[in-house]
């Protein structure tokens, strides 16, 4: 069996690391334009949340920031959230490796 995902996109915000139950945790949000145009002739963008832990979380928060392009290698993991005595199921992307690819574009002066 294989559970592997590779994403390349632009970080939508700076990354902050916080202490979780089992170590350090960071949530990253990637903006990834689709490879095809919609009915209006423009490209839609998907926003994908990812989670990094411990050293990956620390290194990513120190080296990458909002607007930077990164590559993520990871896996998809199911999760269960209990809200008001009701279970909700979802998926999350777990970052196993984050690679800095390029900086955000410089604003024109």
Descriptions of predicted regions:
Residues 1-109:
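Single-stranded nucleic acid-binding surfaces, predominantly the OB-fold ssDNA-binding core
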